[in-house]
Design a protein with these regions (language model features):
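Loop/turn residues immediately N-terminal
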Residues: 30-32, 70-73, 113-116, 155-157, ...
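C-terminal outer-membrane/trafficking sorting elements
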Residues: 296-304, 308-377
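Repeated scaffold domains used in trafficking and secretory/extracellular systems
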Residues: 12-16, 52-57, 94-100, 137-142, ...
Length: 377
């Protein structure tokens, strides 16, 4: 169940951080919000600047490091009782996208032009340790300790360092599209999301990656509560959810306002917390899994054109008989229900533009395949 937390936010919230005791930090635009009671009450912290917070890193019991669109680093060591800021790189030249401090003194920032910055004095000064200058972007970064880390780029590959950024190894993923987010739930196991809807997984600290789900749209924020259970958000408020370490996935609508997107999601004290483009914050519990996606069955389930205008073709294996085609809108309403044939042409000219879910089920309601598509006119 997705429950909206009443915060008074009216602007985009890009990042969520969690202290070890479960206290929440939600940042975006020029205001930071802080809650010590699971989102029931909030304290607003003005950053006194004109730049948006893009990403943050929580370290220890009291410290937070935040990067902004103006190439500034904001730092607190006492839970926002005091704040300091420092310059990183060159504003307007290399944008900052992700930050990770494995310890209080050592931190890394990933950014545009495939650049990585490093600080060894708690964020006061920064050195450029990787700059490929190819026009691409490093979208996310994660360090296991002060020396061993990984960053993801806009061409579907990773860079790994074992010596604090002195040298880097290029690691390819199964994809060629931007890798939006990476999260490691143990020292070895991690997941990554892509702008083309795929999800990939590693079991060896990012040295090798395998595709575990080919979805649609763009998968974004990754968050796992433990090795078995986790979220990966998708376009237009939809999300994927697994309870078996990514072997199977559910696909459902989150309940955010139509057209809004979930930008970040974090787990704390038994709940997931999600931040949205319109400033809404959701607290998530008692998850219901309506359908399960089996990737091997999806291989024979195709829908085109995508985006659609007036009709869609739905194709699946000819030996699939006695099936139904269900199409749902982004609010979860069933808008089309009909018998499935191996090659269906379905009229959608009476449906408005937007994101839709198409599933193939038997007469008992068991889902055998599912995909998404958009209608655009």
């Amino acid at each position: 169940q997705w429950t909206k937390i009443l915060t008074g936010f009216v602007e985009e919230r890009t990042s969520i951080g969690v202290f070890p005791d479960g206290a929440l930090i939600v940042a975006g635009n020029t205001v930071l919000s802080y809650s010590e009671d699971g989102g029931s009450t909030w304290e607003f912290v003005s950053l006194d600047m004109f730049y948006d917070v893009r990403n943050l890193s929580v370290v220890g019991d009291s410290s937070v490091y935040m990067i902004t669109s103006g190439n500034m680093l904001w730092k607190t060591s006492d839970r926002f009782a005091t704040m300091n800021y420092y310059s990183v790189g060159f504003p307007g030249v290399i944008a900052l996208y992700a930050i990770d401090f494995p310890t209080l003194d050592t931190g890394y920032i990933a950014g545009g032009e495939k650049t990585v910055f490093k600080s060894v004095d708690g964020g006061i000064t920064w050195d450029t340790i990787l700059h490929e200058a190819t026009g691409g972007v490093f979208y996310d970064i994660h360090f296991f300790d002060n020396n061993h880390g990984i960053t993801s780029d806009s061409e579907g590959s990773f860079r790994i360092t074992y010596d604090g950024g002195e040298s880097w190894v290029n690691v390819m993923s199964p994809f060629t599209n931007p890798i939006n987010d990476i999260e490691f739930i143990t020292d070895s196991i991690g997941y990554a999301s892509t702008s083309s809807g795929e999800i990939c997984k590693t079991s060896d600290q990012g040295e090798n990656w395998v595709s575990i789900l080919s979805g649609s749209g763009s998968t974004k924020a990754v968050c796992f509560a433990n090795e078995q259970e986790g979220f990966i958000t998708n376009d237009f408020g939809f999300y994927y959810y697994t309870i078996d370490s990514g072997h199977t996935w559910s696909y459902d609508f989150s309940g955010v306002e139509f057209g809004e997107e979930v930008l970040d999601i974090q787990f704390a004290e038994g709940y997931y917390y999600a931040s949205c483009t319109n400033g809404d914050i959701f607290k998530i519990d008692d998850l219901y899994i309506p359908v399960t996606i089996f990737s091997q069955q999806q291989n024979d389930f195709h829908l085109f054109p995508n985006p659609a205008t007036d009709f869609v073709h739905v194709q699946f294996a000819e030996n699939t008989s006695g099936q139904l085609i269900n199409i749902y809108d982004s609010f979860g309403h069933l808008v089309i229900n009909q018998q499935a044939l191996p090659n269906n042409v379905i009229s959608v000219d009476n449906l408005p533009s937007g994101l839709y879910v198409c599933e193939l089920t038997d007469y008992n309601g068991q889902t055998s395949a599912i995909t998404t598509f958009t209608i655009s006119r």
